[in-house]
Every structure is written in structure tokens, then in C-alpha cells.
């Protein structure tokens, strides 16, 4: 039963990761998960700006969304002395740049997304895509990047967990530190360092789980079955996506709590 479930999970996670829109005329292949992630990042950024979206410059907004999208993996790469992944991918700039342009060049695309995200479970669908992509960053840009680093190696468990966790939530850390989701940027101590966010906790648990599940010695300590790389990544995607989806509900509950006093004041 466990083997069957794991195999099905591997097929789903990696099947979604491989799904893409083919554009033969242009010779393009656009991965669905990357497109959904780009839309989610830009929509979240545009929503956070509220009315101040008209005050930001094009370069400022693009840089903010790039940090939000790839800040985690880039932070891990810098720590390990590796080239930034976004510099090795023309596709990244095409997908995220085009999505950013659509979001801020006219009001209609954002209004359409507002309608789309109002549909039940739609936000969770985009968030699940975000979770699968982040898991790939945790695994490839964090844990495996440490294992393949000649100066570190496969036995550096702490480095794996740190770089893996940063790959999953580093973008949010930089966004919070420099207030990138506002029109005026300023540096201050990241609030996430005082109170860990759901993203940080989920990313940390994902890095810890993957490292433990693929390391025989750690499996013995945590009493876990040893998993292959694909199996461990698939279950890690469940852990991270589950945490991020939970965050969407928490955020919604908090918003409703804030709206209730305002409605009561209006009634009075």
C-alpha cells in the first residue's frame, strides 16, 4: 500500500513538473508550474501594493518580483559559491518578465485574476504549484547543491538543511527585510527572524525531511524508511505544499477577523 501510494505520488509530482505548453512556431516550451508560479507571485505583489502600485517604477517592480520568485535559490547559490540559477535560464526571464508586464501594463489582467482567485480552491491550486516548485529548489538548489559541493560534501547535514530551508523561503526573507512589497523600500530586521512564518517552518521541515529520508544514518535516528531521491522529493512536495496551503487558510481567517470589527462599526 505504501509503495503504491508513493509511486502514484511520484507520478503526480513529476508528471506535473514535466507538463508544459508547447509553442512549435516559436520553439518554446513553457512549463505549467512555472507559469502558475509567475502568476501567483505577480498577483500577490500587486495585491500587497494596493493603491501604491502606480508609484513604483518598472525596474523596481521587476526586481521585487524576481527576488520574490528566486531569492531563496539565489541566496543558497551565493552561500555555496555557485552561479545563480536565474542567470542560466532565459526561460525564467521570459515567463516572469512577461507575466509582470501583463500584470502592471493594464488593469484588466489583475481584475481577471481577482475573479479567478475568488473561485473556491483556485488559490490553493496555485499554491500547490508553488509548493512543488519550491520543493525542487529546496532539493536541487539546497540539499543536493551542498552534497555536490566539493568543499562541503554529502555528510554536511546542517549545511543541507540550512541551504535547503533558505532555498524554500529566502525570497520571503529578503522581501520582509527590505519591505519589497511596498512602494518605498527600507531595510530593517526581518520580522521573520523574530517570529518564524509558516513558509519558513514548512521550508525547514521539508529540507529536514528530505535530508533525513535520503540519509541512512539519519533514517535510523528518526525511525524513517530510506527513500530514493524521487520518492523523497515527492513526499517533500506534499510537506511543503501542505504547509503553504495551510497558510492560505490562516491568512484568510485573519482577514475575516479584521473585517468583522469594521463591519460592526458600520452597523453602529
Give short role names for the model-derived ranges:
Residues 74-82, 105-115:
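Transmembrane alpha-helix boundary signature
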Residues 23, 153-268:
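C-terminal transmembrane helix-loop-helix hairpin of multi-pass membrane proteins
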Residues 45-48, 138-145, 248:
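Transmembrane helix-loop junctions and nearby membrane-interface residues
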Residues 1, 82-87, 143-158, 218-224:
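Helix-coil boundary and interhelical linker segments in multi-pass alpha-helical membrane proteins
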Residues 1-93:
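N-terminal topogenic module of multi-pass integral membrane proteins
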Residues 11, 33-40, 61-71, 89-107, ...:
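Mid-membrane cores of alpha-helical transmembrane segments in multi-pass membrane proteins
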Residues 109-189:
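Membrane-proximal helix-loop-helix units in multi-pass membrane proteins
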Residues 57-63, 120-124, 191-196:
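The feature identifies polytopic integral membrane transport proteins across all domains of life
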